Regions:
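Adenine nucleotide-associated cytosolic modules
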Residues: 1-111
């Protein structure tokens, strides 16, 4: 029988190649805060990705609510990237999230 720890990420220990410390130390840039960006950030937060950066220049619109899991009606008019980061932190307070509301080309290599 396999022993599983009490860690938040204990179920991942069942995957023999999984290395939580690598994901926890990772710096990941998500370009775009639409439906796909929402899902990616949600999953990264839930799995404990250490440092998530999100860039998007748009604001949350009504049409986003039916396809973007991290947006709520109360977020209408707010920057998508900022809202996504706030929700990711609600999902997992142990991660670091930072947003940019500018084109990815302007971020440079020092993100």
């Amino acid at each position: 029988m396999i022993e599983i720890s009490d860690s938040k990420y204990s179920r991942f220990e069942l995957i023999n190649w999984w290395k939580q410390e690598i994901l926890s130390d990772a710096h990941i840039l998500v370009v775009g805060g639409g439906a796909l960006g929402n899902e990616i950030v949600k999953n990264l937060a839930m799995t404990g990705a250490g440092h998530i950066y999100v860039t998007d220049m748009d604001n949350v619109e009504l049409s986003n609510l039916t396809r973007s899991v991290l947006f709520r009606k109360s977020d209408l008019g707010e920057p998508k990237a900022k809202t996504i980061c706030r929700r990711a932190k609600e999902i997992n307070e142990d991660i670091s999230v930072k947003y940019f509301d500018q084109p990815v080309q302007r971020l440079g290599l020092g993100v």
